[in-house]
Amino acid sequence: MKGELRSLLLPELRLFNEAIKGILSSPLSGKLGIAVSGGSDSLALLLLGAVSDFPVEAVTVDHGMRPEAAEEARFVAQICQQIGVPHQILTTKIEANGEGMQAAARIRRYALMAEWAKEKNVGALMTAHHADDQAETFLMRAARGSGLNGLAAIRPDVVITAEGQKLRLLRPLLGFTRSALAEIVEKAGFTFVSDPSNDNPHYDRTHFRRLLKASPWINRQHIAEAARYCQQSEEAIEWITAKEAAARIRKKGEVLYLDPTELPIEILRRLVLRAMETITGNTALRGSALSRFIRSLQQGKKVMLADVIGQGGEYWRFYRAPPRKKAVL
């Protein structure tokens, strides 16, 4: 079966193998995992992975959120058996958190797969994010006014943390379109399932998906390429920021000192963020409040943001604000 499959998918397989080797930012330890839901995207990933240059195992998570999910997981298991790929179904129940069911399901799914990867000696898990996903994410973030880091969108090689579990993710399909992946599945003679939530207008992504579908003149792969350039630019700026931080940030007691002279505003912003994150551990500081904070420091003012007091001057000073006094009733 694998020999026949390899012959059928040879052109796509060459691109796939090259993509994996091209996106690995550090050596791979262990096997490659494949996250498979039964949709066309992940089935194409499974088929390519099965005949790739790498040893693979597959995993499917059944959240129990849809009545047909268990049947879809068994459908994937049958295909894996047919093409000779080890496969495991992980089951769980989802409880909504403050971010909603979809976010809770995503976190739980990745936590389960991280545990599975550790047990199976899987060094990285491949997911089926593709050029259309990348284009949708890029446009969504551009519409929200995201900066360079946000426009970098879906990284091809990244380590995430879910419920305290670390998991390395690889996205080797970012150069493939959704339609090309569906063609791979059909060429190999398989069918796939459809997730109705992909067309749910409740989610912002659905509207951007419809926008792209109604605009065939928009080249998804070109947008994905733009996101890749943003990723490279982000990495370059972070490299410069790390060097400037080592030279310009000093700690004396509980106070951090920053030399702000002759710095581009983007590097200065990132250095201020590093100083504040060092003090509070808060990595979510962004947006207009941070811009106002920096402008006040440039004017030599004393100002507070997110429990950090900043004082402008020749050297900017940062320290944790004293605890607020509780009101006496």
UniProtKB/Swiss-Prot annotation:
The EC number on file is: 6.3.4.19
Q: Name one GO molecular function term.
A: tRNA(Ile)-lysidine synthase activity
One BP annotation, GO: tRNA modification
GO cellular component terms, alphabetically, are: cytoplasm
Name a Pfam family for this protein.
ATP_bind_3
Localization (cell) = Cytoplasm
* Catalytic activity entry: cytidine(34) in tRNA(Ile2) + L-lysine + ATP = lysidine(34) in tRNA(Ile2) + AMP + diphosphate + H(+)
**Highest taxon of source:** Bacteria
Q: Where does ATP bind?
A: S37, G38, G39, S40, D41, S42
The UniProt keyword set, sorted, is: ATP-binding, Cytoplasm, Ligase, Nucleotide-binding, tRNA processing
Family assignment?
A: Belongs to the tRNA(Ile)-lysidine synthase family.
Record-linked NCBIfam families: lysidine_TilS_N (TIGR02432)
Tell me the HAMAP family matching this sequence: tRNA_Ile_lys_synt
Query: What PANTHER family does the record tag this protein with?
Result: TRNA(ILE)-LYSIDINE SYNTHASE-RELATED, TRNA(ILE)-LYSIDINE SYNTHETASE
Q: What does this protein do?
A: Ligates lysine onto the cytidine present at position 34 of the AUA codon-specific tRNA(Ile) that contains the anticodon CAU, in an ATP-dependent manner. Cytidine is converted to lysidine, thus changing the amino acid specificity of the tRNA from methionine to isoleucine.
Record note on domains:
The N-terminal region contains the highly conserved SGGXDS motif, predicted to be a P-loop motif involved in ATP binding.
Q: What is this protein called?
A: tRNA(Ile)-lysidine synthase
Source organism (scientific name): Zymomonas mobilis subsp. mobilis (strain ATCC 31821 / ZM4 / CP4)
